[in-house]
C-alpha cells in the first residue's frame, strides 16, 4: 500500500485540543495517509497567521491542509482568504456549527465572551479532576470523599478504575470503592449530599472469565478463591443487595464499553442535578 503524505496544519486561538481531536478522528478513516501535524496554538493576530502561511509556502510542492478553530470572525476570514489565494485546502470547524445554531434559533452569537479564560478554567478543572480521581482509586483517601462528584462501588474487576479515569478526563471528580464479600462496607455514603453513587455489577460468568485472565497474566493461576464460581456469584449478589438497600442506580457493565458506561453515568449525574 502506497502512503500519501499530508502536512496537516492545525490552527487554534486556544490550546488546540479541539482541532487536534477532530483531526485525529478524521484521519482514522485514512490508513494510507502518512500525516505530519503542525499545531499552531494561541493564534491571536494576523502576524502569527502570516508566519504560518510562510511556513506552509515553504512546503508548497507538498500536500498541505489547514484546519482551524479560530472563533474571531475577522481573523478566521484573514486565514481563509489567504489560504484561497495560495490554493491551500482550508476548513473551519466551529464556525459552521456556530452559524447553524445561530440561524436555527434566530439569535446572534455572543461577541464578547472571554473564551480563553473559560477554556483555561476548563483545562485546570480537568487536571484537578484527574488528580483527585487518581488519588481516590480503589478506596484510597476516603477522608475527603465528600469532594467527589461521582462515586463508583463494585466488586473487583468491574471496570471501576478505567471508567473513573475516563470520567475524570471529562472533568468529573470520581472516587471508586471496592466491595469485598464478608467485609463490612466501611464508608457511610448516605450522609453525602449532591453526590451520585453508582453500583457497578457484571454477569457472573463474564467476571469469572475476566478474573481467570487476570490470574494468568500475573502467574497466579493457583489462586482458587478469586475466580471461584460460587464465591464470585455470592460476591455479586451481596454487592447488588447493598446497592438496592441504598437505592443506588445499578449499571451492568457486561459487554459494554467504558464509553457506554460513562455516558450512562453522566446521564444519571445530569438527572440528579436537574432534580436538585
Curated annotation (Swiss-Prot):
One of its GO terms (molecular function) is protein serine/threonine kinase activity. InterPro entries: Kinase-pyrophosphorylase, P-loop_NTPase, PPDK_reg. ADP binds at residues 154-161. Keywords: Kinase, Nucleotide-binding, Serine/threonine-protein kinase, Transferase. The keyword Repeat does not apply. Pfam families: Kinase-PPPase. Its EC number is 2.7.11.32, 2.7.4.27. Coiled coil: none annotated. It catalyses: N(tele)-phospho-L-histidyl/L-threonyl-[pyruvate, phosphate dikinase] + ADP = N(tele)-phospho-L-histidyl/O-phospho-L-threonyl-[pyruvate, phosphate dikinase] + AMP + H(+); N(tele)-phospho-L-histidyl/O-phospho-L-threonyl-[pyruvate, phosphate dikinase] + phosphate + H(+) = N(tele)-phospho-L-histidyl/L-threonyl-[pyruvate, phosphate dikinase] + diphosphate. It comes from the Bacteria. Bifunctional serine/threonine kinase and phosphorylase involved in the regulation of the pyruvate, phosphate dikinase (PPDK) by catalyzing its phosphorylation/dephosphorylation. Belongs to the pyruvate, phosphate/water dikinase regulatory protein family. PDRP subfamily. NCBIfam families: PRK05339.1 (NF003742). This is Putative pyruvate, phosphate dikinase regulatory protein. It comes from Wolbachia sp. subsp. Drosophila simulans (strain wRi).
Amino acid at each position: 500500500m502506497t502512503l500519501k503524505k499530508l502536512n496537516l496544519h492545525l490552527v487554534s486561538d486556544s490550546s488546540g485540543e479541539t482541532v487536534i481531536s477532530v483531526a485525529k478522528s478524521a484521519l482514522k478513516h485514512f490508513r494510507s495517509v502518512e500525516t505530519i501535524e503542525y499545531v499552531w496554538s494561541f493564534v491571536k493576530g494576523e502576524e502569527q497567521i502570516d508566519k504560518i502561511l510562510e511556513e506552509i509556502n515553504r512546503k508548497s510542492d507538498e500536500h498541505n491542509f489547514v484546519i482551524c478553530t479560530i472563533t474571531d470572525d475577522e481573523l478566521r476570514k484573514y486565514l481563509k482568504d489567504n489560504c484561497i489565494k495560495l490554493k491551500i485546502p482550508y476548513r473551519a470547524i466551529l464556525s459552521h456549527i456556530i452559524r447553524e445554531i445561530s440561524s436555527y434559533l434566530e439569535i446572534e452569537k455572543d461577541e464578547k465572551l472571554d473564551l480563553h479564560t473559560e477554556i483555561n478554567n476548563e483545562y485546570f478543572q480537568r487536571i484537578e479532576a484527574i488528580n483527585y480521581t487518581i488519588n481516590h482509586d480503589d478506596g484510597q483517601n476516603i477522608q475527603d470523599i465528600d469532594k467527589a462528584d461521582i462515586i463508583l462501588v463494585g466488586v473487583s474487576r468491574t471496570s471501576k478504575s478505567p471508567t473513573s479515569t475516563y470520567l475524570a478526563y471529562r472533568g468529573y471528580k470520581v472516587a471508586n470503592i471496592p466491595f469485598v464479600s464478608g467485609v463490612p462496607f466501611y464508608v457511610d455514603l448516605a450522609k453525602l449530599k449532591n453526590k451520585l453513587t453508582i453500583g457497578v455489577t457484571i454477569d457472573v460468568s463474564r467476571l469469572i472469565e475476566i478474573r481467570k485472565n487476570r490470574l494468568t497474566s500475573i502467574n497466579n493461576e493457583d489462586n482458587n478463591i478469586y475466580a471461584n464460581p460460587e464465591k464470585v456469584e455470592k460476591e455479586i449478589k451481596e454487592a447488588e443487595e447493598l446497592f438496592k438497600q441504598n437505592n443506588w442506580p445499578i449499571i451492568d457493565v457486561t459487554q459494554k464499553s467504558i464509553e457506554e458506561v460513562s455516558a450512562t453515568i453522566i446521564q444519571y449525574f445530569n438527572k440528579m442535578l436537574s432534580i436538585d
